[in-house]
């Protein structure tokens, strides 16, 4: 992870807070943000509480691998279509700026069943629907898709109880982040795996 760059919202901020990525990986993740705000270079809050224009922060990095995750905030604040359009534009911008650098687009992580009831856009069935669209989007651009749900969801598709870190049913504890980081390290993404997302799912 020493040459990895994590880009995203407060969920990705956990990689700056917990082992094994803390003080190792570069984390350009900002609280309560969505792709459209990064595209417009809004000021965002870093994990340490400092504030900076988000795209300006991202574009000066020199990673060997990039891991991107957005969606939790966007699904609450805008339509699915708007989120996917802005996400597509941001991925294009990242491809242009970091030409030749592998970009891994991660699935939106699962929430607790209770959180899905409180905020229907974050219900796990809906999240899986959007993840299908994100997977197709990533593959269509020649990027890699990582299904973090495999490491974080229980048999019912909800965030595992032993990974729940806060009252909101979204963010995880150190155990959850360790499992997530291990999944990233142990899953090589290859083209045959990604082909399935082009032809399957409701957004195919």
Regions found by a protein language model. Name each.
Residues 2-85:
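Conserved SGNH/GDSL esterase-like catalytic core that processes O-acyl groups on lipids
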């Amino acid at each position: 992870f020493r040459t990895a760059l994590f880009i995203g919202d407060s969920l990705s901020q956990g990689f700056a807070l917990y082992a094994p990525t803390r003080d190792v990986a570069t984390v350009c993740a900002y609280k309560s943000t969505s792709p459209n705000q990064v595209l417009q270079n809004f000021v965002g809050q870093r994990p340490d509480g400092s504030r900076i224009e988000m795209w300006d922060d991202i574009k000066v990095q020199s990673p060997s691998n990039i891991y991107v995750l957005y969606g939790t905030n966007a699904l609450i604040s805008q339509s699915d279509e708007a989120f996917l359009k802005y996400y597509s534009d941001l991925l294009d911008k990242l491809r242009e700026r970091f030409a030749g650098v592998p970009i891994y687009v991660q699935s939106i992580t699962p929430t607790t069943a209770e959180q899905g009831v409180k905020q229907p856009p974050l219900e796990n069935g809906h999240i899986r629907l959007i993840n299908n669209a994100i997977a197709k989007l990533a593959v269509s651009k020649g990027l890699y898709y990582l299904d973090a749900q495999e490491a974080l969801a229980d048999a019912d598709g909800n965030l595992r109880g032993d990974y729940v870190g806060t009252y909101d049913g979204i963010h995880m504890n150190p155990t959850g982040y360790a499992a997530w980081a291990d999944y990233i390290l142990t899953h090589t993404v290859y083209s045959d795996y990604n082909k399935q997302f082009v032809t399957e799912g409701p957004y195919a």
